[in-house]
């Protein structure tokens, strides 16, 4: 998005709008995650429904319940681990995000090219190369974690630190960084991808809220239209991409 905006700059928008836009439209992708993985992320269920839907949350007779509504402890502890993984990004966002963002906006020697653009270009290539290198290194290893329930708090924190790299360096894929980190510590591709997508739910909602608050809700009609269209397109595209990706990585690696 940062590189595209350099080629096709937004017209008739307020200062700082694009910084907010490229974060907020990702809510469309997060909504796609919620829709596709609802059976795995929603921890409550009706006790009368004894058989879980295929690929849904794990149900147990020991799960606490109020009346006919029970709480899947398996799903509950998954969300606790997601909170642990969010801690590095939350600390960074509150303390350093503004300062780092301003530093990356500085031009290089009056050339009109910002540090941000250079970092984005470098990180796009570097992350792609890392996927190839790490997949080659990982090809003969057997994953030690093949279920979400097997993730430890240590695993969650390491994945959260990988996410921090993506938050600090523009152009670094958040999903790419966390999936690579997860694979390196012995987590299967499917579990790595699922946990990464679930982790994005609170992170991107929080990041979007923070950006909108800083922008001040002072949208023009054009800006509001851009946000709505961008978010809807993000949602539709993500539905297809996520379905394809989850099916693809069950049989293939990320080297393509």
Feature roles, as predicted:
Residues 1-256:
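Multi-pass membrane proteins that catalyze or facilitate reactions on polyprenyl-/lipid-phosphate substrates
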């Amino acid at each position: 998005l940062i590189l595209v905006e350099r080629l096709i700059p937004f017209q008739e928008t307020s200062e700082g709008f694009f910084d907010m836009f490229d974060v907020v439209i990702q809510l469309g992708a997060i909504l796609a995650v919620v829709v596709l993985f609802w059976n795995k992320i929603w921890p409550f269920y009706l006790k009368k429904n004894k058989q879980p839907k295929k690929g849904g949350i794990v149900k147990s007779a020991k799960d606490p319940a109020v009346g006919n509504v029970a709480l899947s402890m398996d799903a509950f502890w998954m969300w606790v681990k997601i909170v642990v993984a969010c801690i590095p990004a939350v600390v960074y966002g509150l303390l350093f995000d503004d300062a780092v963002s301003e530093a990356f906006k500085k031009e290089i020697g009056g050339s009109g090219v910002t540090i941000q653009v250079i970092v984005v270009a470098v990180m796009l290539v570097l992350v792609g190369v890392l996927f190839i290198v790490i997949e080659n290194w990982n090809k003969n290893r057997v994953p030690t974690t093949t279920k979400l329930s097997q993730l430890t708090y240590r695993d969650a924190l390491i994945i959260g630190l990988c996410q921090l790299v993506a938050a600090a360096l523009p152009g670094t894929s958040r999903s790419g960084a966390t999936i690579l980190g997860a694979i390196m510590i012995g987590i299967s591709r499917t579990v790595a991808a699922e946990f990464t997508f679930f982790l994005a739910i609170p992170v991107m909602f929080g990041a979007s809220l923070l950006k909108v608050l800083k922008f001040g809700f002072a949208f023009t009609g054009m800006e509001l239209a851009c946000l709505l269209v961008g978010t809807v397109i993000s949602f539709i595209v993500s539905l297809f991409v996520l379905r394809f990706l989850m099916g693809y990585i069950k049989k293939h690696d990320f080297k393509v």
